[in-house]
């Protein structure tokens, strides 16, 4: 039989209620939210949406290999309209570690950055990781607490969930799967292509102002300045997805 059921509702409130109703009847259901055009890039609300979307994607991936019964995904019209990378690419990006794994911290750091994680001195929030000698802390959007991996040389010696505030261990794990901290995973060539497309689009838009034939208005000057900042903003945030061919 089938493993998934997709239900599309007219708005978020109905979608969330449907998930709650399904849980009441012991049916596995998860809500997949749409991006909020206004708040998606804001730290607090944007991270919440990102977390929900990534948790849903990870549940779908896990269910395909280990789940029994039917997983119901509930979303809205806006939710199914969002463009995503193929699920196979998302699966390929997942890193699974256990006590037989060997890790070179800086190579892992490069992979984590490509997966959307932000390197910090100390992990405080989801989407961050930190490396201090042979200690690697990772806080995935799909987890409720960060994970600390301790190395003996390059071998995994300990995998534990820990509390952010107290730094105390919560639970010892036998293995740990690191899911991407972004919905968009690109190769280096795709990123370069995306940046090139952004620059081309910026130049085309600036030409529309026809600077040589008429005096620019205040609004045109402001728009031009904003366009010139676009490339720098994209490089800073990694928001290439709209401009890539994937």
Where are these regions (language model features)?
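ASCE RecA-like P-loop NTPase motor cores
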Residues: 1-246
